[in-house]
Curated annotation (Swiss-Prot):
Residues that hold S-adenosyl-L-methionine according to the record: R75, E104, G105, F106, R254, D275, M276, C277, N278, H279, S325, G326, F327
Swiss-Prot/TrEMBL GO biological process terms: actin modification; peptidyl-histidine methylation; positive regulation of DNA-templated transcription; regulation of uterine smooth muscle contraction
GO CC terms of this entry: cytoplasm; nucleus
InterPro entries: Rubisco_LSMT_subst-bd (IPR015353), Rubisco_LSMT_subst-bd_sf (IPR036464), SET_dom (IPR001214), SET_dom_sf (IPR046341), SETD3 (IPR025785), SETD3_SET (IPR044428), SETD3_SETD6_MTase (IPR050600)
Organism: Otolemur garnettii
Function noted in UniProt: Protein-histidine N-methyltransferase that specifically mediates 3-methylhistidine (tele-methylhistidine) methylation of actin at 'His-73'. Histidine methylation of actin is required for smooth muscle contraction of the laboring uterus during delivery. Does not have protein-lysine N-methyltransferase activity and probably only catalyzes histidine methylation of actin.
Entry protein name: Actin-histidine N-methyltransferase
Enzyme class: transferase
Post-translational modification: Phosphorylated by GSK3B, which is required for recognition by the SCF(FBXW7) complex and subsequent degradation. Ubiquitinated by the SCF(FBXW7) complex following phosphorylation by GSK3B, leading to its degradation by the proteasome.
S-adenosyl-L-methionine in keyword set: yes
UniProt remark on domains: The SET domain specifically recognizes and binds actin, suggesting that it does not accommodate substrates diverging from actin.
Subcellular compartments: Cytoplasm; Nucleus
Amino acid sequence: MGKKSRVKTQKSGTGATATVSPKEILNLTSELLQKCSSPAPGPGKEWEEYVQIRSLVEKIRKKQKGLSITFDGKRENYFPDLMKWASENGASVEGFEMVNFKEEGFGLRATRDIKAEELFLWVPRKLLMTVESAKNSVLGPLYSQDRILQAMGNIALAFHLLCERASPNSFWQPYIQSLPSEYDTPLYFEEDEVRYLQSTQAIHDVFSQYKNTARQYAYFYKVIQTHPHANKLPLKDSFTYEDYRWAVSSVMTRQNQIPTEDGSRVTLALIPLWDMCNHTNGLITTGYNLEDDRCECVALQDFRAGEQIYIFYGTRSNAEFVIHSGFFFDNNSHDRVKIKLGVSKSDRLYAMKAEVLARAGIPTSSVFALHFTEPPISAQLLAFLRVFCMTEEELKEHLLGDNAIDRIFTLGNSEFPVSWDNEVKLWTFLEDRASLLLKTYKTTIEEDKFVLKNHDLSVRATMAIKLRLGEKEILEKAVKSAAVNREYYRKQMEEKAPLPKYEESNLGLLESSVGDSRLPLVLRNLEEEAGVQEALNIKEAISKAEATENGLVNGENCIPNGTRSENEDLNQEENKRAVEDAKGSSSDSTDAVKK
């Protein structure tokens, strides 16, 4: 994928002879592991911790310089071999070619006219690198013993990639040689480039990604040096931080979920050829054909010969694109910023508000999102704000009053306010909250635009400033939208306009409504941030059903490395193991990891 593929040429053909002892690196990684396993820093201390971790990582990188396995020549020199290998193994290679589109990097260009919805690309399972193929590879024995590898498919896939890269006769060599030698994910940012993200909503995920990656490397360095099942791994004599950073970046920018062979569950996969497609706005047009056992992609739109072929990666924010894919997408119609909100337990009405929220399937405290498009808030956030601003009498009506179920049902529907006063309160609150968030940035929108226009910036610095600017523009838009809504509902209240009343006959209208905010909360496929997704049973059920039904790759099925999903679930477990390792545990086995 081109924007994820802005790379330098690769340098050498084999790993160099080690000039530093494993024991010396083991001591440094133990120190790194201990640092990365310490409790989360307090407010305002994250940058300090990041700098300390980075200092240790740079010390390790300096000692390991020149030890990584890379390839001779330019990346594009290996494209003919990739196409030949793909063709010989049943993939489609007609109708497109790989081309450097400069700003977007490498991508696919149509060599003939392709019609919208035409099947133009398919890749059989045989060519995919998956968690299943990792289990059946040289990594298998260690995988069977290490709980982290078993629980975190993205890490297993990263090690699978490293082991195959270090094996000259690997079946996947033509694919691996065509991958970038470095990426534009924040793992590759210089410290000054990361500094541009200070005070942004995204910086916390950047810190988390860096810390988790460093911790994982330190943990697995010891595993590879001491575990008996790691003796035969081709990484035994050379496993550098540079290697691991490259592998996790390759996986996080390319991984997707596909069904297992029997279709009973999903697994993570790297998909050659298809992963060269760049992103644009649209709909997901890639799926998995279980009958033919292959990944298939149909054209998003008409593509004329000579035009770049785009696909839609999914409804991701620019923060997600920058952090997990290494690019910023201008005019992202799905861009959004996080906003953390919660009902205080000291609130006199906390118990009642918590009960109403529970009936609507919403947690009392969570991460929501403000959106780039109108309306700036989703049905879920609207419902939360309505409950947050309810009076005691309004809460009673939603718990005990007539039509209480209907009232819960319409909480997320903009057509049915709780009261005019409630609407004024919630939009006033949102306006104030977004205004406060804007004040936390160290630069203004105008200053960011000036820097982008008048300074010679690196690609990564440009991405960081664009992300910072984008967050502020969304917040500013939310402030203006909230102010307009506040005044509208204040006028309704002053004029004592009658409140719209919900009736069952309204249901058809609600279901056919275009605007997301008009849909009743319980009918809506909520599109919120990861923290909210995990807290909502409704969303979880819908997502799982869709993944199972479609067997889809791309879109929202990706599991990025280090900031959420599997990693968050395993932080406690991994930390426990990490602390044990840092203390110098003599056990060679990782069986001690508690689930």
